[in-house]
Every structure is written in structure tokens, then in C-alpha cells.
């Protein structure tokens, strides 16, 4: 065989291999749990039961750094945080709100707040909720990645909860408490929920089930 024939066969094989890799790549990416970030996202779950182990200030600082690394509309950063490690205050939160019982046993809770006046005026003011939500998810993921367990407990938009937290933490009127994130070392294993549902996905336009 001529050298040029060998070269053509080699090129064809190379092309075949590249095409195979390219076609199979999205499948591989979808289930790639080798990647630590993807793995942490897929294995995070709400943790509502904690061991007695304390959470160090340096660890809380890392959680807050992760929260403040979140995307934020116009880089306005309207998020504000109140770290609660006072036992009595945590107990009060746990007793006041049925959905936040775990606060009574948590070593620490971070109250994720927003200052709407710090973001865009007018219609854009609602971005504060998205910004504080992005920060909250970052904090949850950081906690999980560091071996902690956490749960997002909703405050805003339930007015009664907003008022109670405002009074409990002496929040000024222009600061809105959005969520109470209880954090601690998990007391046992929790299984992440599988929420994958391809029916929620539409490509290019919304398709009705009959299409
Ligand atoms: C806006 C919001 C409010 C929530 N409020 C509470 C709450 O008050 N108490 C609670 O135990 N969990 C609360 N959760 C956690 C959800 O129950 C939890 O995320 C959901 O059941 C899915 O489970 P997973 O986080 O383990 O994936 C809240 C979550 C979100 C996003």
C-alpha cells in the first residue's frame, strides 16, 4: 500500500474517533459524577438533624464567602446576613415556627436577608430575591461540600414570619429576612432526592404533551 493510502486510513480513523467522542459527550456529561462540583450539586439534600458538633467561625466565614460569590444583578449585591449562634435565639426560632423546628438543635443558622434599596429601582427591585436566593444555594452547596448539612427555611414572602424575624433580630425596616438556613454536622446519612424529570424540558419553544 502507498504511504498516501495509509495516511488516508489514519485520517479517516481519526475523524471517526473524534465524531464518536463528540456525539457521546453530552451523554457522558449528564451523568458525570466524577466531577466534584457536579457531584456536590447532585448529592446535596436538606439536612434537618445535627450532631452536637460545633461549627467554627472560620467555617461560617467560608460559607458566607461562598454566598457572596453568587451571581447578582448588576453586581449590586443586595444580600445581607445575620449569623445566629445564640442558643436561646435558635431555640426561639425552633419554637416559633413549626417548619423550622430543627433550628432549636442547630449549632448555627444564617438568616439570609435582602436590602431591596441596594438593587435596581423600579421594576428591577425584585431582583433582590433572585440575588439572595442564588447566595442561599451557594451557601447550601458550600456547606454540603464541607461535610456540613443545611436546610433552607423560607421566611419571605410570608409576612407573619418576616415580622417575627424582624422583631427577633432587631432588623431595620429596609432589611427583609428571606430565609433561615440552619447549619450543622449531619446526624446520620440522608439520601438525595432524584428530581430529574425530562417532561419539564422544552427545546426552542413550549411543546404541549400532544405535539
Ligand atoms: C423557598 C424554600 C422554602 C423552604 N422552606 C422550608 C421550611 O420552612 N422547612 C423545611 O424543613 N424545609 C424547607 N425547604 C426545603 C425543602 O423542603 C426542600 O428543599 C425540598 O423538600 C427538596 O428537598 P432537598 O432540599 O433535600 O432536595 C424550603 C426550600 C425552599 C427552596
Language model segments and positions:
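Acidic, surface-exposed loops and disordered segments
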Residues: 2-211
